[in-house]
Design a protein with these regions (language model features):
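Short, flexible/disordered intra-domain loops and linkers
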Residues: 17-22, 91-98, 136-143
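A metal-dependent, Asp-based hydrolase signature
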Residues: 104, 117-173
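Active-site neighborhood of HAD-like aspartate-dependent phosphohydrolases
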Residues: 66-122
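Short, acidic loop-to-helix structural element flanking the phosphoryl-transfer center
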Residues: 142-149, 176-203, 214
Length: 319
């Protein structure tokens, strides 16, 4: 069917199992030939945007989800991409009791003995404590802790001294066990490759943890498309904080009017970008708030990166 569990050593001291789904027409057609079943959609988002139209191999667009493009849209020289819900589809289960039972055993091996419920409670409390610490240091910013500090403090609370690498390992084990799948949306690589070929500068601006996301970008094969990867944990603040946007604009010497923000959250991505004079593209994906939309240069009313590629890569003709 195209789904599979892929074993991959992407982090030290454990085997991560990441779900991969290769969304290609060839796989769908092969599946139809082998099973005799018709595929009605290859979209995981809120709306069916590509569907089988009766005749084998013929795919049509649903007009309800046609992209909206503002007239006279400027040509942009650089793009800031959100990750999860924009380029990457992900599902984690951090509330799973089996996760916390496993992590309690993991900590016990290092001499830090927790019950599963105690560990879960202390984890949440320490996340909040780290946010309060950062807020006290800079009251004007929206705080984003580094999760490895939390896992370090969980050891320290039980009187166990570990290295920062051991805290990072614990964080990555936590991520791998809670992860149900992480995969690219259909057309993500092609979009990045085409923009790169046109000489555009590509950046990540995402609310994410360095200890999780850098490895996931490499696993998915898109890390090297970006000129710079900015993750909120490295900046101790997160979107929609304008300081986070400005940090990347300033460090790269970018003119905001020549940069487009592409994301799936009107609140986190679009509002601040527009307030700074940037262009903006909103994508309503399966991870966007239900019923949300936006008023910006491009509105993708469903996840459809191939159509976005066509829009962006001929943008000079739209201006």
């Amino acid at each position: 069917s195209g789904f599979g569990i892929v074993p991959l050593n992407i982090m030290p001291h454990y085997l991560a199992y990441l779900t991969a789904y290769e969304q290609t027409k060839e796989i769908l057609e092969s599946y139809e030939e082998e099973t005799g079943r018709k595929i009605c959609t290859i979209n995981d988002g809120d709306g069916i945007i590509i569907s089988q139209a009766g005749k084998k191999g013929r795919y049509i667009k649903d007009e309800r989800y046609t992209p909206i493009v503002a007239p006279g849209m400027s040509e942009y020289q650089a793009y800031f991409f959100d990750l999860y819900g924009t380029l990457i589809d992900i599902h984690t289960e951090e509330g799973d009791h089996e996760l916390w039972e496993f992590m309690a055993k993991y900590y016990a091996y290092k001499g830090a003995k927790y019950g599963s419920w105690e560990l879960r409670w202390r984890y949440g409390a320490l996340i909040h404590d780290e946010e309060e610490r950062l807020l006290h240091e800079n009251p004007k910013q929206i705080p984003e802790p580094q999760v490895e500090r939390v896992f370090m403090r969980l050891y320290e609370e039980k009187g166990v001294r570990v290295s920062i690498q051991e805290a990072v390992d614990a964080a990555q084990v936590f991520r791998s066990f809670s992860l149900r799948y992480v995969r690219l949306y259909y057309g993500a690589k092609e979009l990045l490759a085409h923009l790169k070929k046109k000489g555009k500068k590509l950046y990540v601006l995402s609310n994410a943890q360095q200890v999780f996301t850098a490895s996931e970008l490499r696993y998915l094969g898109i890390y090297d498309y970006f000129d710079k990867v900015c993750l909120s944990s490295d900046y101790h603040c997160k979107k929609p904080d304008a300081a986070y946007f400005k940090a990347l604009l300033t460090s790269e010497g970018l003119d905001p009017t020549k940069v487009m923000m592409i994301g799936n959250s009107e609140y986190d991505d679009i509002r601040t970008a527009k307030s700074l004079g940037m262009g903006a593209c909103y994508i309503h994906s399966n991870l966007s708030p239900e019923g949300e939309t936006a008023n910006c240069d491009i509105v993708m009313r469903a996840m459809d990166l191939p159509s976005l590629e066509k829009i962006l890569c001929r943008e000079a003709h739209l201006a």
